[in-house]
């Protein structure tokens, strides 16, 4: 957030935060974990930050009441919010649902079955909402996503996120361990793999497309502009591209490249981009034509 922002950011993954995101931008991403009693819980981290043994801090080893007592909302709490679901059903909004695999302390080693159970529960929960097609995406970093889809038989659009990162530990360690996976997979290779698996979208880190890291992959690099962008268009064809993070200074460039942004920057007090242009937060659900863009950018 800008240092002078007066906006109070809601708790990540809370119903309040997701309602705000649904109203302010084109949709939201949320994280789900599975409790011991089979409830889908809106929580990101592999362990709760408490001074307790790991097996007492792991969400997958707790029941939903124990997790809720820590201030965590259930997925059902979100679906009970008409403010959220009405926008999902009628305002061209999308919801990306990231399914989390458990910390090793849980001793849940069959990630494909664990994810398949979550997928089935998600699809069953959404059955009566009558959502528009392609308004929901399920995904995760686990390489078992495709196997889980096969096991569950769900029909929701799905994909695997890249690079594959270990599901536990500190962020820096995760990135370090994930480096070989990042280096060995080019954008072209990722697109071919996802297409082969019947996945409509490639979800990837920005480093694949921007910065010096894009040069360390095998083959010719792609980028957000110039010849690299033309190369990206050629290899992606009609595949959707979901990319994170989305820095403010790159928002317009990424949108012009046809990329779906996954951004944490949903502060309603941010009205302009670093280049001085107006920031329009709903380019997909309420797109502006060129006349409106010019009018907004020329306004005082």
Identify the residue ranges that each predicted region occupies.
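Phosphate-group recognition and catalysis centered on beta-loop-alpha active-site segments
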Residues: 1-300
